[in-house]
Amino acid sequence: MKALAKLKKQPGIWIINDAPIPEYGYNDVLIKIKKTAICGTDLHIYNWDKWSQNTIPVPMITGHEFAGEVVAKGDGVTSVDIGDRVSGEGHLVCGQCRNCRAGKRHLCRKTIGIGVNVQGAFAEYLVMPAVNVFKIPDSISDDIASTFDPMGNAIHTALSFNLTGEDVLITGAGPIGLMVVKIARFCGARRIVITDINEYRLQMARDFGATVALNVAPFKNQDELVKQMRKVMSDIGMTEGFDVGLEMSGINSAISMMLDVMNHGGKLSLLGISAGDISVDWGAILFKGLTLKGIYGREMFETWYLMTSMLQAGMDMNPIITHRLHIDEFQKGFEIMKSGQCGKVILDWSS
């Protein structure tokens, strides 16, 4: 089968045409891939950064955001049928630890990821345990379903706390941050402010309903950044701090600024992964009585049900997809992702 694989311990990704079709077991399904989306994690692997060097076995078929069709299944599978349109939860868990047995599979200590630790979805076929497979409603397109993984991250982050009527600060306007703007607006947030240094994506955020999309690139230090943010808050009629902070960037200055402008009793969801150490103002957390929640992946499968229901109720995520390419144009897709001048990039695996 055709696949994209990390074949060498250096920047890049390579297409192969002779990868074996994976074998499926008693409780597995074999999925024919229709669409995949390129994730920031895939870009890290492509660039072969320090995290990738320490994490990714080589050779490895990568990718974990997908939509496809069930073409075969093990004898023990009763939850899906051949012909079903599906996506799937890319975190594989042990099923035996305390959290798994308590129904908190997203907190499994032994989580491994498809396309990171085991064969991924950048291939014509993928094998996945049936328990990880999620059927796609007819009203949802393959393109949108291929983004369920990052959309689930956005849903988990945004809906960890009530957003209705609240003032929300989002730091980081990558594709997941942009999804969060859509979610917060759909859920009735009062004011939504988002920060980034990428003007292309900030304009997308404005189009998606952000009250203010602030380019923080011009500000030379933390004091200038906080001063400008307080001016923004005043300009839009805020007399107190933000009620909810959604941190998507992993950038030290963004986190510090967020802590500075949160209201007393504010709540923060933290999804962004830092490339290095983060200095934290514990005084702000303590004296403001802030609540912090770390986010890793999606709640299985409550997050999936929530995002499906919201899409069916009219939340429009189609504008997040800015580029659609055939798999043979994968190199162009990765270059577009590297440029940052995009939302989600979808790869079509049809012949």
UniProtKB/Swiss-Prot annotation:
Name of this chain's protein: L-threonine 3-dehydrogenase
How the cofactor binds, per note? Binds 2 Zn(2+) ions per subunit.
Q: Which domain of life is it from?
A: Bacteria
Task: Provide the assembly information.
Answer: Homotetramer.
Where along this sequence does the record place binding of NAD(+)? Answer: I176, D196, R201, L271, G272, I273, I295, Y296
Q: Which gene encodes it?
A: tdh
Family classification = Belongs to the zinc-containing alcohol dehydrogenase family.
Pathway linked to the protein: Amino-acid degradation; L-threonine degradation via oxydo-reductase pathway; glycine from L-threonine: step 1/2
Q: Which PROSITE patterns match?
A: ADH_ZINC
Site positions per UniProt: Important for catalytic activity for the proton relay mechanism but does not participate directly in the coordination of zinc atom: D149
Q: Where is the active site?
A: T41, H44
Reactions listed under catalytic activity: L-threonine + NAD(+) = (2S)-2-amino-3-oxobutanoate + NADH + H(+)
Query: Which PANTHER family does its entry note?
Result: L-THREONINE 3-DEHYDROGENASE (PTHR43401:SF2)
Q: Which keywords does UniProt give here? A: Cytoplasm, Metal-binding, NAD, Oxidoreductase, Zinc
- The residues listed in the UniProt record as binding Zn(2+) 1, with positions renumbered to this chain, are C39, H64, E65
Transmembrane stretches in the record are none
